[in-house]
Amino acid sequence: MLSVCYSDPCLSDFCQGKRPLRIASRNSNLAKAQVHECISLLRSWYPKLWFQLSTTETTGDREKKIPLHLVENSYFFTDGVDALVHKGVCDLAIHSAKDLPETPSLPVVAITRCLHPADLLVYADHYVHEPLPLSPRLGSSSLRRSAVLKQLFPQGQILDIRGTIEERLDQLHRGHYDAIVLAKAASLRLHLHHAYSIELPPPYHALQGSLAITAKDHAGKWKQLFTPIHCHSS
């Protein structure tokens, strides 16, 4: 398969480092870390490969007051990024796989192996030394996570939370919440160290921790390039 990519006129320039892969992503630190992770995986197979990154906002980045359960399985966190590919500005887009809409606007050419599927409940720092209140304020961005929290904390107040990982942690440390839910994969990718956190029990999102790569033209060719890092069980 690798020899096919090196000999294919559509792919050989990328594999040999003669042209950069033009990658689109959101402009958060997490999104950029995901791009570097994906390219690092590819470079294990194509050492000369390099890339140029274009970042942009999506509707979800701009509209931070809309509860996420109202826009699940939509283009909320992919529209602006995929638009760069549609316009020909970029060759590929890299997304958190769980952000993909039910019907993606571009062909999905690969989904990477899950880094970690779990959710973390991250506590405000002072709860290292004291118990949570009887009715803790718990920040969650999905119905699935909220249902798990309700089981663990029947008297808890489940409050919506939005923003980047850094913005959510800032809200936690400024006292807006007693604890918040984050994807463990996000913490790992950003090398975050929480003073006190616990891993929540399942269910987890089926694609949490995986990355999705979308393309417009030559989708079959791109699938060949990404075959070494595509997880066939995803």
From Swiss-Prot:
InterPro entries given in the database record: HemC, Porphobilin_deaminase_N
Q: Which Gene3D superfamilies match?
A: Periplasmic binding protein-like II
Under Enzyme Commission nomenclature, its number is 2.5.1.61
Homology family: Belongs to the HMBS family.
This chain's source organism reads Chlamydia pneumoniae (Chlamydophila pneumoniae)
A biological process (GO) of this protein is: protoporphyrinogen IX biosynthetic process
Q: What does this protein do?
A: Tetrapolymerization of the monopyrrole PBG into the hydroxymethylbilane pre-uroporphyrinogen in several discrete steps.
Identification of the protein by name = Probable porphobilinogen deaminase
User: What GO annotations for molecular function exist for this entry?
Assistant: hydroxymethylbilane synthase activity
Reaction(s) catalysed (UniProt annotation):
4 porphobilinogen + H2O = hydroxymethylbilane + 4 NH4(+)
One Pfam match, by short name?
Porphobil_deam
Which UniProt keywords are listed?
A: Porphyrin biosynthesis, Transferase
One GO cellular component term, please give it: cytoplasm
Give the pathway annotation: Porphyrin-containing compound metabolism; protoporphyrin-IX biosynthesis; coproporphyrinogen-III from 5-aminolevulinate: step 2/4
